[in-house]
Design a protein with these regions (language model features):
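Short, solvent-exposed loop/linker segments at the N-terminal edge
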Residues: 89-95
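Surface-exposed binding patches on compact interaction domains or structured appendages
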Residues: 20, 25-29, 33-35, 40-84, ...
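Conserved, mostly hydrophobic/aromatic
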Residues: 101, 180
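Short glycine/proline/serine/threonine-rich loop/turn segments at secondary-structure transition edges
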Residues: 170-178
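Beta-strand-rich extracellular modules
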Residues: 167, 181-185
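An acidic-aromatic substrate-binding cleft motif
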Residues: 188-201
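Long, low-complexity or tandemly repetitive, helically biased scaffold regions used
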Residues: 1-5, 9
Length: 201
């Protein structure tokens, strides 16, 4: 039995509210930073910077869950251009670390979007294997315990959050670097630089 869209939206609202409560001590969904849409002026300026891929990607940490689906948050147009394709995060050994890639499609519909990964490597040459990572939008395990794969399509003018999960080994320690690759079909991928600081016990 798979969740319906209504079920998923309801769960998303509960999760977002819980995260707000942890961060701020209050629940105020509409005042969330990720609910504040960018201005028309900022959006038009962004659209003049059309990427070679024909769509925008924004790396986003798990503390700023993507909530808008037909307009981008002001946070993205306020960020420095060079940071759009960078994820820097902190996690602990043995943690299941999650983050997001926001894909914005103002110019065209995307068909067959996929995400792949390189290994993450630290200064000592230790690796977190790419096989430890997954994009939940395209693959996973359903409520019956069955594995699945899905084709991800994004309509023109929409924002799609691609959620990523990374299984960090219990032995991992240090700063690990690698890349995620977002692509449509067989086109050239958009590269996102990943830097994870793994520390603690």
């Amino acid at each position: 039995l798979a969740w319906s869209n209504v079920d998923l939206k309801a769960q998303e609202t509960i999760t977002n509210a819980f995260d707000d409560l942890k961060r701020t001590g209050t629940v105020n969904e509409q005042d969330s930073e990720m609910r504040q849409a960018t201005s028309d002026t900022a959006l038009q300026k962004l659209l003049t910077q059309k990427p070679a891929a024909g769509y925008f990607c924004f790396a986003e940490d798990r503390m700023h869950d993507i909530r808008l689906d037909q307009i981008i948050p002001a946070r993205w147009t306020e960020r420095v251009f060079d940071t759009w394709l960078q994820l820097k995060g902190d996690c602990q050994p043995g943690e299941f670390y999650t983050w997001q890639i926001g894909v914005f499609t103002p110019f065209k519909e995307l068909k067959g979007v996929s995400v792949s990964f390189s290994d993450l490597v630290n200064a000592d040459g230790n690796k977190i294997k790419s096989t430890s990572f997954q994009c939940f939008n395209q693959e996973g395990t359903d409520t019956d315990g069955q594995t699945f794969r899905k084709t991800v399509c994004i309509p023109k003018g929409y924002v799609q959050a691609l959620w990523i999960g990374m299984d960090i080994p219990a032995s991992a320690k240090g700063i690990y670097k690698g890349k995620a690759f977002v692509k449509e079909g067989s086109s050239q991928p958009v590269e996102i630089a990943i830097e994870l600081n793994v520390s603690g016990s």
